[in-house]
Amino acid sequence: GSGSGKSAYGEKRILEAGEMTRYYIATMEVFGEEGRKKVERHKMLRQGKGFITIESPKDVGRVEKLEKTGNGKLTVLLECVSNLTANEMFGSSFGAELEPGRRTEALAEKICADIAKIDEAADFFAVITNEVGSDGEMYEKETLEYIRLLGLVNCRLAKMASEVVEVVYGIPVMKKGAEV
């Protein structure tokens, strides 16, 4: 969830990957003062760590600025899939001609294909996401469809990943892969 330490853990993993060109792909669209403060806080926390920031709230597969410098290797931190998914679902006309359930499937495929393009380019790739909808609350139809879409994307990304780590109150809990 929000404030769980996911970002700090992802950054730590990128830094541990060694001396490589470091990219941070930021997907958050800033709305209001709270959003601006969150972005500023994250920028401050990344300061001095050598990240090149690319703002890409949608269509992350079109990110073409990933250049390998130095030793010819690069790492990428993508933050955050939950924002990316919301931006693609609510701020894009992709699949608008499809009925809602089919659009959700098409969006999940698109988002995962876009992320796979980054994975192919990177020597080390960390993806930050959220799990939403497990609180048992009742939601509007559109929100339920977003929760379903994010769940599909997260499941597919977990299948693609060599490691899956849940960060709970700053504590990494290995779900898939080698021990942390």
Residue ranges, per PLM feature:
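Short, well-ordered coil/turn elements that cap or connect secondary structure elements
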Residues: 19, 46-48, 71, 120-122, ...
